Amino acid sequence: MGSVRTNRYSIVSSEEDGMKLATMAVANGFGNGKSKVHTRQQCRSRFVKKDGHCNVQFINVGEKGQRYLADIFTTCVDIRWRWMLVIFCLAFVLSWLFFGCVFWLIALLHGDLDASKESKACVSEVNSFTAAFLFSIETQTTIGYGFRCVTDECPIAVFMVVFQSIVGCIIDAFIIGAVMAKMAKPKKRNETLVFSHNAVIAMRDGKLCLMWRVGNLRKSHLVEAHVRAQLLKSRITSEGEYIPLDQIDINVGFDSGIDRIFLVSPITIVHEIDEDSPLYDLSKQDIDNADFEIVVILEGMVEATAMTTQCRSSYLANEILWGHRYEPVLFEEKHCYKVDYSRFHKTYEVPNTPLCSARDLAEKKYILSNANSFCYENEVALTSKEEEDSENGVPESTSTDSPPGIDLHNQASVPLEPRPLRRESEI
């Protein structure tokens, strides 16, 4: 009789439980075994939403309120604006009420509330709680109407005026600092940093590559921009421990430095699927039946404030398009470059993309088709060039050296010089 696991993250305590978890892991193509069962599983809950928010809830946190109050400044910066305004108003009103009560007690103990008393009062014209409250407001806000003022009759009253002035300055500094820090947060900068809706896998420089596109909608630059990516999936260790979210780094050029990007126009981030890649053994069929999530991160400093911002998104396995490329968005004109963001999320299919894994491709188990086939990006670039020439009055055909039997497509299919694997805008 198998044992029951009381904790979903505990060590597997029996062979039966181990077989159950092994079946779960093998089903999505990431088990420890060599066989893969291609059965479509229910998609996992997204760990990072498309807008960058983490889909995580914290429960059973001990002394949560005390911990948040201990770091009250960060708490005020992180909370919503409506709660910030509530704290702003309460801080001033409570301080006015507190010192108003103090001045009223001083007047009460000194006998200033007795109208028949003719001796000098501690605070002139303070003969009720309302008057004491108004004097407190005038002192802390330095209004000074002139009717109510402290005298030298009571040293304690003089001390309280000085003390309230200091407390008022502290409250002003704290509130203004929190509001300015909240306004200067680079969080809203992420609204103008966009990731493509889908990632793609296609051939680039003779190798299978995972690619996604990132763009900056503002003209202001993102200083020291760099990208990172991680693959999240569940796995079982050799000791039988079930890890629900194992994080594996995806190399996007950290060693060579090409993870640092100049984000002026949309850029395609490229991950070469080599022997060190977690996608090395996955074919198109494996991707279609896999259950994992790729988290992509863009970091940099906001040019206006020099504060670091981080933009996040993620791609599930069913959001990766095998055999697709992104449509070009950057077009060269006479005096400038233009970016067409209506094409930012669009892809087109590349029919000759191998369906096997990168391992099988590296081991020559798949024969590639002619690499010099006419490319869609070349067609778009040539079409744009022809339109520009026609607008300038240049004849469409100006070359007389080409043989009559060779068309434009064959001319465009001349092999180009191999270029190093770098992420760039595709023209």
UniProtKB/Swiss-Prot annotation:
The keyword Ribosomal protein does not apply. Gene3D superfamilies: 1.10.287.70, G protein-activated inward rectifier potassium channel 1. Disulfide bonds: none annotated. Prominently expressed in the central nervous system. Also found in other excitable tissues such as heart and skeletal muscle. S-nitrosylation increases the open probability and inward rectifying currents. The modification S-nitrosocysteine is found at residue 76. One of its GO terms (biological process) is potassium ion import across plasma membrane. It catalyses: K(+)(in) = K(+)(out). InterPro entries: Ig_E-set (IPR014756), IRK_C (IPR041647), K_chnl_inward-rec_Kir (IPR016449), K_chnl_inward-rec_Kir2.1 (IPR003271), K_chnl_inward-rec_Kir_cyto (IPR013518), K_chnl_inward-rec_Kir_N (IPR013673), Kir_TM (IPR040445). GO terms for molecular function: identical protein binding; inward rectifier potassium channel activity; phosphatidylinositol-4,5-bisphosphate binding; voltage-gated potassium channel activity involved in cardiac muscle cell action potential repolarization. Residues 129-140, 141-147 dip into the membrane without crossing it. This is Inward rectifier potassium channel 2. It comes from Rattus norvegicus (Rat).
